[in-house]
Every structure is written in C-alpha cells, then in structure tokens.
Amino acid sequence: MISSVRNCGTIQRFCTTSISLLQKPVEENIVRISNQVMVKFDPNSHLRSLINAGNLRAARQVFDKMPHGDIVSWTSIIKRYVTANNSDEALILFSAMRVVDHAVSPDTSVLSVVLKACGQSSNIAYGESLHAYAVKTSLLSSVYVGSSLLDMYKRVGKIDKSCRVFSEMPFRNAVTWTAIITGLVHAGRYKEGLTYFSEMSRSEELSDTYTFAIALKACAGLRQVKYGKAIHTHVIVRGFVTTLCVANSLATMYTECGEMQDGLCLFENMSERDVVSWTSLIVAYKRIGQEVKAVETFIKMRNSQVPPNEQTFASMFSACASLSRLVWGEQLHCNVLSLGLNDSLSVSNSMMKMYSTCGNLVSASVLFQGMRCRDIISWSTIIGGYCQAGFGEEGFKYFSWMRQSGTKPTDFALASLLSVSGNMAVIEGGRQVHALALCFGLEQNSTVRSSLINMYSKCGSIKEASMIFGETDRDDIVSLTAMINGYAEHGKSKEAIDLFEKSLKVGFRPDSVTFISVLTACTHSGQLDLGFHYFNMMQETYNMRPAKEHYGCMVDLLCRAGRLSDAEKMINEMSWKKDDVVWTTLLIACKAKGDIERGRRAAERILELDPTCATALVTLANIYSSTGNLEEAANVRKNMKAKGVIKEPGWSSIKIKDCVSAFVSGDRFHPQSEDIYNILELAVSGAEAHRFDCTLKRAFGVNLYS
C-alpha cells in the first residue's frame, strides 16, 4: 500500500513537471531524472498517456498550453472527445484547427474521427461540407474516410447517400461491406442488404461473425428461411456456429421464420447464453401466442442468474397483457424498479400498455404522469387505453394535452379517438379528428381510413362514410370490411351484399372479419339461405375455419328466422368453446318467442360460464313474467338480490362546446350536478302545468293557445 502511494506521488510530480516544461522552448525540454538519465520531453506522448488514462481534463490543459500542435496532437484530443460522446466539442476543436493553425492540414485519420462526430450529433450539414472537402482534397480515396462517411450517412438515416458513397469508393474492406449491409438491414431494406452480402461473398473480402449475424437478421426480416439455412451452412464451414452473436442470430432467424423447433434446438445446444439468447426465445413464444411458455422461459432465465434488459421486460409485459395477468405484471414492475430500469422509455410504455389492457387505468395514468420523457408511443398508449375502456372524455383530454405538447399524433391515436367518437355518436369530435388527419397527411392511412368509415357509420352519416370509401384503394381489405359493416348496421343489407359480391368479381380475397360483416348483413335482412351460402363459402372456397363470431352470426340468423331448435343444435355442435354471447343470443330469441324451456337451458349455460351475469338473470325473469309465471320470475329476482347481482345501467353522452360528458340514470358525479338537477326540475314543473291542456288538445283537437 505504501509503495503504491509513493508511486502515485512520483507520477503526480512527473505530470506537474511536464506541464511546466511545456511553457519553455522545445530545445530546453531536457529533464534530469535521479541525476543519472537524460530524456527529451515529448508533448504528444504525454498527451496520449493522459488520454489513455482517461484524464480528459488534464489532457485538455496540456493541449491548450502547447505552443504549436501538430496533426497528431489535434487528432488525439479530438478523438478523445468523440470517444467521450462529446461530439460538439470535437467539432469545435476541428474548426479551430483549420482556422487557428494553418500549418496543420486535415489528414485521413482526423477526418474519419470528425465524420464520426457528425454522425453522433446528427450534424448532417457539417458532415456534407466535410464530404465536399474530402472530394476536393482526394481524401475520399481512403477506405477509412469512405467508411466513416458511409457510417455518418447511415446514422442520420440517409441510407441512399451511404449506398452512393459505397458505390464510388475505389477500395473496400470487410468493415466497409459490413457497414453498408448493417445500414440497409437496420433501415428495413432487408432484400438490398442480402444483395450486398451476396456481392461481398463473391469478392475476396471474407465475412466476419458480425456480418453473418446481420445477414441472418435480414433473412428473419424477409422470412427467408431457405436463404438463412444457406448462411447457416457457411457459418458451420467457417467455424462460427459456436460464436454467441451468430448463434443468437441463427436461433432468432429460425423462430421468426416459423421454424420454432429448429430455433429451440439451437437454443438448447448453446454452450453459453446471454440476455439476447433468452429474450429472443421469450419474444418467439410471445409471437406464436404461447405467452405462458414465455413466462416460464423468463423464470428459467432469472434462475440462470442472467439479468433481463429493456427488451426482455417489454416482451414480458406484453405477455402479461395478453394473459390479463395484472398480478404478474405488478411483480415484473417491482423487478424493473429493483434493477433501475424504470426510466427506460420502452419499459415504461410496455408497463403502461399492460396496466391499460388489464383495466388498471389509474396505475397507467400515474405511470404516464411520472415519466421524465414521453414519445408518441407513450401518448398513443394512454389515449388508446382510455378510449378502448370506454372513457372517451379522458381520452380526448389526453389528446388535447398531447397537442399542446407539440407531439404529432400517430395513426393509432387518431384511430382510437375516432373509435370513441363513433361509440359515443359524437360526430363533431370525429370531424375534428378527421381534420387533424388531413392536416398531418394521415387520411390515406389504412387504419385511419377504416376508422373514419366506422365513425361516420356509427354516427349515422353513412353518406360521408361512403364518400371516404370511394377514395380508398381497391385492395384495402380493412376499409372494405368497414364499409360492408356500415351498410349492414344501417339496414342497407342489399348495398352491403352487392359491395361484397362486386369485390369478389374483381379478385378480392375476403378475410374472416369480412365474412362477419357480410353475415351480419344477411342477419339484418333475414336472408337465411344466402347466409348459409357465405358460411359454407368461407370453409369450402377460402379454407377458413369459422370462428365463434361467425357461429354467433349464424345463430342470430336462425333465431331471427324462428328456428330456435336449429340454433340450439348449432351451438351444441360448435367446435369452439361456447361463450355467453351465443347463448345470450338464443336466450333473447327465446324471450321474443316465449320459449320457456329452451330459454331456461340457455340461461343455465350462461350462468355456468358467469354465475353473476345480470343479463341472463334479468332476461330469464322477463321470460317467466311474459308467460305468466310470476312466481318463477320472483324467485329469479330474489336469487339476483342474494348474489348481489345488479344490472349494469345504460349510459348516454352529450357534447357541450368541446366537452363530452357521459352519464347514467340518476348520475350525480358531474361537478355541476346540483345545477343540472335544479334546471331539470324547473323544466319538468313547467311542463307539468301544460300537461292537462295538452291532453285536452290531443283528445278534442282544441288549440287553447290560439
């Protein structure tokens, strides 16, 4: 310990002496150490030693006191600032070098470093001026300058300029090839990335492990498992298969291409696994809908002492949301806090999505308001969460807040607001969102367009919905389905069916949602035979397995036609797990037809699935009442009271100025409820005075106010 302290003191004295010597002429910089050895002091060596030691402040002091820096000293100090991610200071120093020290001309080394600084700081204007300088001074012929220039354009998202620089480079090496392939793949241009990879393979440059890994990522993006297997063969030949980054990319490629078993086999055979290995498997399970497997994999990962990263938690919160496991999500939230990842934007967004999906909007809102920074995903998530939960007023408030923050809305945020406008039949609010979509150039977005059609249809303006549909592309399946559904809901079944038939003639391939819409049109128009025709078409012509929603349409169609026995038979023969929706459809039909026994059976099936279902109990009581079985009806209502079952009241909404308010019967939660009820009582009492006169007028045709 004592010797270490002495050494530190010696180093400190040496550094102090060195700095003072820099103030003397170079020829006087001779130091006698221990009165025995004579050494000449080299400022650049001392500068590099300070830089290598990570002491940037001392290095800058030494540099500033140097009477005349050369290209080596300038490059050293600029490079250190770039390494420290202080690109702005690096660019200032480079500018000073060119202005103050005319004797020093930039070379390939310093130009490469400064181009990297431009990429880090996204200073594209400065970078382009350096590009021009490199062309003018013929420094662009250097493979290092070319690679740095290529990388700079790639970093700022100008991948086409990167490709142009690459094509003009007289010499290329493995780093250059890998840089252009990486840029293309990260930009989502997987096919071009693989084209460059093929050219590289044909050249004399050999791919390294990272090049193979990025090429496998391109295969995954294109779902090109055949090409991926070919690369896998090359990886085996080169002996890279045990390299962790390559093994991870191989496993990810197979799972993303649907070859889950091959990906799992690679994962099991890995000699070592890191967070990327585990996370890719978790993501793969989540992608194919096996969320429970994803959770089990996460537990194994934690037991393996591998700490999760942001992507791991984002995938896990998504899995919990899909499973509606709020408790699991809350436990993960505790893990995030313990690992200090709560400031991660992607983690916060995924947590907020989980809370919203699981119905805990209070926690989602608290999380949102506590975020240090927010992106458009944050805003879209909180707006969508409130809108999808039926709290349109809160959704619009958050949207207004987002607009005040200057954040540009996404298609998802606009679609959520259009959905809530349609559900609450607030056409003025929907039109304002439509205007915003036009303002931000999102009106041609498929999601926004279909949401506009739905909104106008639900608000009763089928004409405006039809006008928007007339401007859509023919192959927009979502908008077509929305329009068919809009016609069906407006009782325009003929228009809905005609549109569907017309689309089939032009080669349109319907999906399962389209068939739900057209079956709904058949249901509303009572076209039983045509409904069965389409129901069979989706299975025989398009090889689609009917979902429970399709069966629900057919059960409704049979019930409306009075064929309750056939409807019950279809429900019992369903391959899907029976839910309360189809049984409720049958129960309501039994009420209309007075079919007590079948209605009781339907109610029993519903109560097996949900013992506290108010709709089933109320409808069953009404069936008994309408058929004179008052004692049975009373027993059902007593049973409801004993279980604490309360029928959920219906609600209405009203828009006053820019505020939408939703309310139920007897609602007193509005801040101005006392004033509202006072005015209502005045209106009722005023109407009561004219009630008798109005009755006389209706009875005898006498106008008492003439």
Swiss-Prot record:
The keyword Transmembrane does not apply. GO terms for molecular function: RNA binding. PPR repeats lie at residues 39-69, 70-104, 107-141, 142-172, 173-203, 208-242, 243-273, 274-308, 309-343, 344-374, 375-409, 410-444, 445-475, 476-510, 511-541, 547-577. Transmembrane segments: none annotated. Residues 658-688 are annotated as: Type E(+) motif. Belongs to the PPR family. PCMP-E subfamily. This is Putative pentatricopeptide repeat-containing protein At3g47840. The lineage of its organism: Eukaryota, Viridiplantae, Streptophyta, Embryophyta, Tracheophyta. The gene is PCMP-E43.
